[in-house]
UniProtKB/Swiss-Prot annotation:
Catalytic activity: (R)-4'-phosphopantetheine + ATP + H(+) = 3'-dephospho-CoA + diphosphate
Principal subcellular localization: cytoplasm
Protein name: Phosphopantetheine adenylyltransferase
Keywords: ATP-binding, Coenzyme A biosynthesis, Cytoplasm, Magnesium, Nucleotide-binding, Nucleotidyltransferase, Transferase
Disulfide bond entries: none
InterPro entries in alphabetical order: Cyt_trans-like, PPAT, Rossmann-like_a/b/a_fold
Highest taxon above the source species: Bacteria
Organism: Oceanobacillus iheyensis (strain DSM 14371 / CIP 107618 / JCM 11309 / KCTC 3954 / HTE831)
Entry annotated with the keyword Nucleotidyltransferase: yes
Binding site for ATP: 10-11, 18, 89-91, 99, 124-130
Site (Transition state stabilizer) residue list: 18
Length: 161
């Protein structure tokens, strides 16, 4: 497929499910920019700067992936970066309805940029950042659910180090 894709999200924090989608996107596109966007409907645990650092630590082994952040509309950001596509991960059918609404609006804003949906691997179909934060908050075992830098950061955030 080639070219440039944007992989947007709040990544609060990045999970192994996110990492799965990012890695697979990097196998399809020449370049992937993982972009941290603030979701106004969520109260983040990690600052944008912390999320960028965690992403960079988690994806440094993938040479064609970089990390950025934006507070603009996704389609404006994608146009500015000259992206050809947006990669969105889906865990289950329930994600599709929400993502379809966003995609329809994004098409209205810029019909030249395609949205590609990737189903996460089955082992991550239950995984969400919210769930990981809840488990970590009560000192539960999150190994295998998040990259190692995230596991350490969550333990530090909840004072379990």
């Amino acid at each position: 497929m080639g070219k440039l894709a944007i992989c947007p999200g709040s990544f609060d924090p990045i999970t192994n499910g996110h990492l799965d989608i990012i890695q697979r996107g990097a196998n399809v596109f020449e370049e992937v920019i993982v972009t941290v966007f603030n979701n106004q409907s969520k109260s983040p645990l990690f600052s944008v700067t912390e999320r960028i650092e965690l992403l960079e630590d988690s994806i440094k082994h993938i040479p064609n992936v970089s990390v950025d952040s934006s507070s603009r509309l996704l389609m404006d950001y994608a146009r500015e970066k000259k992206a050809h596509a947006v990669i969105r991960g889906l865990r289950a059918v329930s994600d599709f309805e929400y993502e379809m609404q966003i995609t329809s609006m994004n098409r209205k804003l810029n019909e030249d940029i395609e949205t590609l949906f990737m189903m996460t691997n089955n082992q991550y179909s239950f995984l969400s950042s919210s769930m990981v934060k809840e488990i970590a908050k009560y000192d539960g075992n999150i190994s295998g659910l998040v990259p190692e830098p995230v596991e350490k950061a969550l333990k530090a955030k909840f004072n379990y180090l």
